[in-house]
Structure formats: C-alpha cells, structure tokens
C-alpha cells in the first residue's frame, strides 16, 4: 500500500514549505514556497554560507550605500536560495516581497520587478516564479497589475473569505489560505479542541475552494500553515497544499488511508458584481480573527526580515 504522502499526491499537488534544500531532496515536491521567516532559518544553515557570501559580494557591486547594500543582499539571498531549490523541483518557487511593503502597492510592484529581474539574470524564466504578497487590499491590487504583465503571484496571509473573493476577482494566479493559524486563534479564543473535519481552518479552505469552483475562477487554491496531518488529509483534493518538512516526513512514514474530500463541481454559476475597496475593508473589519492574524503575520515576517538584515549588515560592515 502506498504511504499517506503518495496517496495524497494522487489527488493534490504537493508543495514544500521550506527553504531547506536537504528537506526538499527528501520529499520530492512539485513546487516550493519560502517566506522571510524560512529564509532567515535557511540562512543559518552552514551549507548556505556560500549563497550568503555571493549575495554580499553582489550587493557591494551595486551600491556604496550600506542601507542599499543590506536591502540588495537580502533580495539576492532570497533569490539565491530560490535558485538552489529550482534545481530540485520541476515546478515553481514562491519568493516573497518584503512584508514591510504590505500597504504600498507601488513599492510592492517595484520589488516584484526586482526579484523577477534577479531570477532572469540567473537564467530562470518568470514562468517558474511566483511573487508572494500579503493579502492586503494594496497587495491584491499590486498582484492584479503584475498578473496583467504576465508575472504570476501567490497571495499569502489569507485568513478570510473577503480576501479570497478579492483575489479571485483580481485574477491572481494562486492564493495561500492559512489553516493552522486560524485554528490557533479559535483554540485560544474558545478554549475548545476541534476534530480535523470541524477545524475552522479546514472549513475556511473548503468554503473558499467550493466558492472558486462553483463560480469558475481559475485562481489556484493552495492550503498552507498546517498544525497536524489530520488537517492535511481533510483537504485531500485541494488544488495544492504547501506543507513543512516535518509533516511531509510524518506522512511519508504513515500508511493512513487518504480519501478525496474536495472535488470541483461541474455546475458553475457566474459570479456577482466585483467587490469594492470599501466592501473589502468592511468585511475584513467584521472578521476579528482575520484582522488579528493578518496584522500579526505581517509584523512577524517584518521582524524576521529585520533579523536577516542585521545578520547581513554585520557581514557587510
């Protein structure tokens, strides 16, 4: 009998949520995703020192200004790690725009262009890159413009139906609705434990998936942020699932049967009017969990970006 991971792969495209190249070699995913926290973690792996040295050396050729060098080195390091991962996966790498730009559409677009240029200079076509942006109104608007240029985007830190609807209406390539962080909030808020089938994060992704398929949206749904394998198995059939190394390895060592839970409907209905900015902001405001988790996620990614830059600054000085 195939192990749990192999069974899941028959229903869903598996993506590795890590910057650890050795972990990717073991799990053999289709794609991989990174974020500022994962880049910071990867930068502390001794085997990656050459990638850091390369980023530092490159940054020094771009500017004499230390702050500019730090920013350039951070961008180049994220791309360098992405380049190594692309040697191991047949599909795409998701590389994230600085979380501190989450409320600046123009700066987010400029950063996306820079990341794409760095990949292209290394011989990687933009068709293998997903630009990750936080699912703020500004991030979604930035993604809409980037998609119009042929730059595909992955909208992350997505916790609400309003975010999912706005992303679909903007025509973004892929969304990453979070599962585990939603569960964290509800467990803390209610003091309850939840069975996997009733997990609020699982329910959220299921609702988004069904809405997208019912209205014929092409945006890919990639569940993210898992706390246990039960959540993952409950989302078998989702377009994609991005999973951390420890849970991938746990499923590879398990023979738990996997049954498809999500199936696209063949009965589609045209969507209604496009959501306005005012509607988006009101619906977000009414969802305390989504407001809190989005803000917390942006803050935490910004903190880790700052830590990475401090590490690079010490090497540049």
Curated annotation (Swiss-Prot):
Pfam families xrefs: TAL_FSA (PF00923)
Subcellular location: Cytoplasm
Chain segments annotated as coiled-coil in the UniProt record: none
SUPFAM superfamilies: Aldolase
Known pathway: Carbohydrate degradation; pentose phosphate pathway; D-glyceraldehyde 3-phosphate and beta-D-fructose 6-phosphate from D-ribose 5-phosphate and D-xylulose 5-phosphate (non-oxidative stage): step 2/3
Active-site residues, Swiss-Prot/TrEMBL: 132
MF GO annotations: transaldolase activity
Enzyme Commission (EC) number: 2.2.1.2
PROSITE patterns: TRANSALDOLASE_1, TRANSALDOLASE_2
Keyword Transferase (UniProt): yes
Keywords (A to Z) from UniProt: Cytoplasm, Pentose shunt, Schiff base, Transferase
Keyword Zinc: no
Catalytic reaction list: D-sedoheptulose 7-phosphate + D-glyceraldehyde 3-phosphate = D-erythrose 4-phosphate + beta-D-fructose 6-phosphate
Any single GO CC term annotated in Swiss-Prot or TrEMBL for this entry: cytosol
Class of this enzyme: transferase
Domain of life per record: Bacteria
GO process annotations (BP): carbohydrate metabolic process; pentose-phosphate shunt
Family as reported in the entry's similarity comment: Belongs to the transaldolase family. Type 1 subfamily.
HAMAP family to which the protein is assigned, alphabetical: Transaldolase_1
Role description: Transaldolase is important for the balance of metabolites in the pentose-phosphate pathway.
Summary of subunit composition and partner proteins: Homodimer.
Name of this chain's protein: Transaldolase
Encoding gene per record: tal
């Amino acid at each position: 009998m195939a192990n749990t991971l192999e069974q899941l792969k028959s229903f869903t495209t598996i993506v590795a949520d890590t910057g650890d190249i050795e972990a990717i070699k073991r799990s053999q995913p289709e794609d991989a995703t990174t974020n500022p926290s994962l880049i910071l973690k990867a930068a502390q792996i001794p085997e990656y020192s050459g990638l850091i040295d390369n980023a530092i050396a490159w940054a020094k050729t771009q500017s004499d200004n230390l702050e500019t060098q730090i920013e350039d080195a951070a961008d180049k390091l994220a791309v360098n790690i992405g380049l190594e991962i692309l040697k191991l996966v047949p599909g795409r790498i998701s590389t994230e725009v600085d979380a501190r730009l989450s409320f600046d559409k123009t700066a987010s677009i400029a950063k996306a262009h820079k990341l794409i240029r760095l990949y292209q200079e290394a011989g990687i076509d933009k068709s293998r890159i997903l630009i990750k942006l936080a699912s703020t109104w500004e991030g979604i608007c930035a993604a809409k413009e980037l998609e119009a240029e042929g730059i595909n985007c992955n909208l992350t830190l997505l916790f609400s139906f309003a975010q999912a609807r706005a992303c679909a209406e903007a025509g973004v390539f892929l969304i990453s609705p979070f599962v585990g962080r939603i569960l964290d909030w509800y467990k803390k808020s209610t003091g309850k434990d939840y069975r996997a089938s009733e997990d609020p994060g699982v329910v959220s992704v299921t609702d988004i998936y069904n809405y997208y398929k019912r209205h014929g949206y092409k945006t890919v749904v990639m569940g993210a942020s898992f706390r246990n394998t039960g959540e993952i198995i409950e989302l078998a059939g989702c377009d994609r699932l991005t999973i951390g190394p420890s849970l991938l390895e746990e499923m590879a060592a398990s023979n738990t049967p996997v049954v498809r839970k999500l199936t696209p409907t063949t009965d589609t209905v045209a969507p209604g009017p496009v959501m306005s900015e005012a509607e988006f902001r009101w619906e977000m405001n009414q969802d305390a969990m989504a407001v809190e988790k989005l803000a917390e996620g942006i803050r935490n990614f910004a903190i880790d970006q700052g830590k990475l830059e401090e590490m690079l600054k010490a090497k540049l000085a």
